[in-house]
Amino acid sequence: MTRLGLVVAEFNRSVTERMEAAAREAAADADAAITDTVHVPGAYDSPLAADRLARRDDIDAVAVVGAIVTGDTDHDHVIASATADTLTDVSLERDTPVTFGVSGPGMSGAEARERVEKGAAAVESAVSLTQEL
């Protein structure tokens, strides 16, 4: 059984709570266990939580979910890029799969609500990588 850590960004909570539910359902379908869940303020805050989970012996992989909605500036692009880069660093430094189930950037709130399946996809990828590696 794959043991997962789950990081959930709270910003845009109406979307991310549905992403979390999709992630939990995907874990159950894959016969994986979510060992621990860490809620963080926003996607940008997720790398530290992912790193702490990836250090643990009782976690095989970490799935991160969040939603980055566009605003009046390019801030969403900056946040998404920095988050993706840093989560990749965590995965490589810890030799642990850290999957990116963060929707955005460049999407509206309505588009974010249509993409809650990224929560399930993050878990499915984490399980797949754990089994493959």
From Swiss-Prot:
It is an enzyme of class 2 (transferase). (2S)-2-hydroxy-3-oxobutyl phosphate binds at residues 72-73, 115. It catalyses: (2S)-2-hydroxy-3-oxobutyl phosphate + 5-amino-6-(D-ribitylamino)uracil = 6,7-dimethyl-8-(1-D-ribityl)lumazine + phosphate + 2 H2O + H(+). Pathway: Cofactor biosynthesis; riboflavin biosynthesis; riboflavin from 2-hydroxy-3-oxobutyl phosphate and 5-amino-6-(D-ribitylamino)uracil: step 1/2. One of its GO terms (biological process) is riboflavin biosynthetic process. InterPro entries: LS, LS/RS, LS/RS_sf. Its EC number is 2.5.1.78. Transmembrane segments: none annotated. HAMAP family: Lumazine_synth. Belongs to the DMRL synthase family. This is 6,7-dimethyl-8-ribityllumazine synthase.
